[in-house]
UniProtKB/Swiss-Prot annotation:
Keyword rRNA-binding appears in the UniProt entry: no
Region (Essential for toxin activity): 40-41
Pfam family, one: Bee_toxin
Gene Ontology cellular component terms for the protein in this record: extracellular region
Annotated source species: Apis mellifera (Honeybee)
Descriptive protein name: Apamin
Keywords, sorted A to Z: Amidation, Calcium-activated potassium channel impairing toxin, Disulfide bond, Ion channel impairing toxin, Neurotoxin, Potassium channel impairing toxin, Secreted, Signal, Toxin, Voltage-gated potassium channel impairing toxin
Location of the protein in the cell: Secreted
A GO molecular-function descriptor: potassium channel inhibitor activity
Disulphide connectivity of cysteines: 28-38, 30-42
Note: Negative results: No activity has been detected against the following channels: KCa1.1/KCNMA1 and KCa3.1/KCNN4/IK/SK4, Kir3.1/3.2, 15 voltage-gated potassium channels (Kv), 10 voltage-gated sodium channels (Nav), TRPV1, three ASIC, three types of glutamate receptors, and three nicotinic acetylcholine receptors (nAChR).
Biological processes annotated in GO: negative regulation of inward rectifier potassium channel activity; negative regulation of potassium ion transmembrane transport; negative regulation of potassium ion transmembrane transporter activity; venom-mediated perturbation of biological process
Highest taxon listed in the record's lineage: Eukaryota
Summary of the function given for this chain in its UniProt record: Toxin with unique selectivity to KCa2 channels. Potently blocks human, rat and mouse KCa2.2/KCNN2/SK2 channels (IC(50)=27-140 pM), and moderately blocks human and rat KCa2.3/KCNN3/SK3 channels (IC(50)=0.6-4 nM), and human (IC(50)=0.7-12 nM) and mouse (IC(50)=28 nM) KCa2.1/KCNN1/SK1 channels. Does not show any antimicrobial activity.
Length: 46
């Protein structure tokens, strides 16, 4: 039971991390960032 919950938790965290890193890259427009993630991404990369 515990191992199953741990697997689910790992699976969800991996999805969240990948979506966090992939989503801002695709639609971002640094001249007019739509979201806070985009703005942060653009600040980091100049």
């Amino acid at each position: 039971m515990i191992s199953m919950l741990r697997c689910i938790y790992l699976f969800l965290s991996v999805i969240l991390i990948t979506s966090y890193f992939v989503t801002p890259v695709m639609p971002c427009n640094c001249k007019a960032p739509e979201t806070a993630l985009c703005a942060r991404r653009c600040q980091q990369h100049g």
